[in-house]
Curated annotation (Swiss-Prot):
Stored PANTHER family: ADENYLOSUCCINATE LYASE (PTHR43172:SF1)
Molecular function as annotated in GO: (S)-2-(5-amino-1-(5-phospho-D-ribosyl)imidazole-4-carboxamido) succinate lyase (fumarate-forming) activity; N6-(1,2-dicarboxyethyl)AMP AMP-lyase (fumarate-forming) activity; nucleotide binding
Catalytic residue positions: H153, S284
Cellular component terms per the entry's GO annotation: cytosol
Annotated source species: Schistosoma mansoni (Blood fluke)
Function: Catalyzes conversion of succinyladenosine monophosphate (SAMP) to AMP and fumarate on the purine salvage pathway.
SUPFAM superfamilies: L-aspartase-like
Catalytic reaction list: N(6)-(1,2-dicarboxyethyl)-AMP = fumarate + AMP
EC category: lyase
Annotated binding of N(6)-(1,2-dicarboxyethyl)-AMP, by residue: Q236, S285, K290, N292, R324, S329, R333
Name of the protein in question: Adenylosuccinate lyase
Amino acid sequence: MDEFEEYRNPLTKRYASREMVCNFGEKRKVILWRQLWIWLAETQKELGFDITDEQINEMKSQRDSVDFGTAAAEEKARRHDVMAHVYTFALACPKAAPIIHLGATSCFVGDNADLIMLKDGLNILLPKVARCIDRLAKKAMLHKSLICLARTHLQPAQPTTMGRRICMWIQDLLLDLENLERLKNHTIRFRGAKGAVGTQASFMDLFQGDHQKVIKLDEILTKKSGFQRSWCVTGQTYPRKVDIEITNALSNIGATVHKICTDIRLLSSFHEVEEPFETKQIGSSAMPYKRNPIRSERACSLARYLMHISTSMVSTVSVQWLERSLDDSAIRRIVLPEAFLAADACLTLLQNIAEGLIVYPMVMEANLNSELPFLVVERILVKMVSEGAANRQECHERLRKHSHEAAAEIKLKGLKNSLMDKLLNDYYFAPIHSLLPTVLDPSYMIGRAVEQVEVFLNTEVDPAIHSYKDCLALNSNITI
C-alpha cells in the first residue's frame, strides 16, 4: 500500500520529534518486553532457578530481532498481544523457550515496559522545558528595562517592562518543570513482579513459599529497570491514577504554551513583537503583505488538544473494576503516547519561537505614549492634593471630565490623545503644570519591575535549570 493511501497520525508525521516518536514505537515496546523477560530470567537464576547462561545468552542475542509478521499472525489467532510475542520470542530462542515469561503475567511486561517508556518520555521533555526557560530568560534579561504597556482585560492598565512580562511566562514553565521532576523522581514507580492480581502468588509457588526470595526478585528487577522503588500494592496493573498524574502534568504544559503563544499573537497584532519569519515564508496566498504568527497558532492548536487529553484518563481510572478491567487498554495505547508527542511538539515550537522572538521597542513606546496621559491621572490627582492646591472631589471631577472628552476625540474623530493639552490649558491645574513632564515619565511608574526580573532570574530560574546546563545549547529547528 502506498504510504499516502492510509491515515498517518500528524503528531508522528509532522510535529513531534523523532526521539519521542521512537520512544513510543512498537519496536521499542517489544524490545522492552524482551528485555524484561531477560531480566526476569537473570534474576530467577541468581535466586536459584535452574536457568543456564546459554538460555539467557540466546535471549540476549535475539532481543532486537523481532519477527513482527509472525507476531501479528499469532495475535490474530490468539487475540492476545503478549502471548503472541511470547510465542514469537520462543521460536527465535528454542533453548530458552521453557523459561520465557516464567511466573509472569501480561502486565509484567506490558505495564513495566509502559512505565519505562513514560519515564523516558519525561526525560525527553524535561530538557525541552529547561531550554524554553533558558531562551525566555535570555530575552527577559535583555528587555528587563524596556518599558511597555501592561494590559488587564486586554485593556490598557499600567506600564511594565517586556522583561517582566516574559518572566510571567517563565514562572508558569518553572511550575511545569517542577511537576515533571516530581513525576519522574517520586510518582512513577516500577510495577515489578506482582502476579495476576498483585498478590505475587505465582512467584510464591515458584519459590516454594520463600517470602524473602519473592521480595528479592521484585527488588532486583526494580533496580535492573532503572527505578528506585516499586509499588507495594497493585491490582493486575500499576495504579492507573499514575496516568492521571502524568496526563495532568502534560495538559498543564499545554495550558502554559497556549497562554504564552496567545500573548505573543496578541502582542503581534499590536506590532510590538513578532515570531520568527523566514525570508521566503508566505503569509497569505491572496495578501502578500501578511506576516501571520503561524508557529504560535500551531502551538495553540496542538496545546488545545493536549489540554483536554487528561480527562480520558480520569474516566479510565473510574472503570477499573476491582482488580482490573480491560477498559484501560485501547485508550491508553492512544492517549499516553499522543500526550507525550503533543507536549513534545508544543515545547519544540515554543523554543523555536523564543529563540527567534523579535521585539519592536519603538512601537512599544508609541503604544505606551498614546495611553500614558490616562495612566497618570491618579498621580496628577495625588500631586494636586498633596500640593494643597485642590479639593480631592472637585479635582477628581475635572480630571474625569477632561479624560472623557479626550477619549471621545480619540474614538469618534481619530485624534491623538489631548488630555495633557487640556490640563495645560486649564488654569485650575496651574500649580502642577511644571510637574507634568515628570509625571509623564513612565520610568517612575514601573515599580520594582527591573529589580524583580533580576532577582527572579538569579534566585529562581538559574538554580532550576542548572542541572540541565549540558543540554541547553541544542537549538530548535522547525521544518514545516
